[in-house]
């Protein structure tokens, strides 16, 4: 995360991420993004959001996943829970901007890629993705 520009990183296997984020921010973050796609991670993200804050999920949960949150907190604490499919990207608008940010050194794209694979490795690539061994892979085409 720090390689990609994060100022802080919390290892959820070492500490309670909700408590750590609430301590770090003095009561919760204004915007919390969940990118894993698990209801546990989304619940933690919501719990780490401050009053008046937004929890944004870009992670794709498995079918049948359900989220339980204190419903009153949405209204009484004026929180927002937002879903964003594929980052709500508009490719024609956003990809040129992402490339510009990358060229300027403001967006570290390389750290988001776990590995390069060839087209004949695509099935192994999907298996590795399903097993959680990689986050992103780029297919290299020999043309």
Question: Model features per residue range: what roles?
Answer:
Residues 1-44:
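Adenosine-nucleotide cofactor-binding segment
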Residues 10, 30-35, 58-60, 84-87, ...:
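Glycine- and other small-residue-rich loops at beta-strand/loop junctions that grip anionic moieties
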Residues 15, 43-47, 92-143:
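C-terminal hydrophobic helical "lid"/dimerization subdomain
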Residues 15, 61-62:
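Flexible glycine-rich beta->alpha loop in the catalytic core of nucleotide-sugar glycosyltransferases
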Residues 26, 37, 50, 130, ...:
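Short conserved AdoMet
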Residues 39-51, 57:
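Rossmann-fold NAD(P) dinucleotide-binding segment
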Residues 40-41, 64, 89:
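Short glycine-rich, flexible loops that bind phosphorylated cofactors or substrates
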Residues 53-56, 69-111:
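Rossmann-fold dehydrogenase core element
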């Amino acid at each position: 995360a720090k390689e990609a520009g994060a100022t802080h990183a919390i290892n959820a296997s070492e500490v309670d991420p909700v408590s750590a984020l609430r301590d770090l921010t003095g009561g919760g973050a204004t915007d919390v993004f969940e990118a894993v796609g698990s209801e546990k991670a989304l619940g933690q993200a919501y719990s780490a959001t401050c009053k008046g804050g937004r929890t944004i999920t870009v992670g794709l949960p498995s079918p049948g996943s359900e989220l339980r949150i204190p419903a009153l907190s949405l209204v009484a604490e004026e929180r927002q829970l937002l879903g964003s499919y594929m980052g709500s990207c508009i490719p024609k608008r956003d990809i040129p901007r992402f490339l510009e940010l990358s060229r300027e050194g403001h967006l570290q794209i390389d750290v988001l890629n776990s590995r390069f694979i060839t087209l004949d490795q695509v099935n192994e690539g999907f298996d590795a993705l399903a097993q959680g061994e990689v986050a992103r892979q780029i297919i290299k085409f020999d043309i």
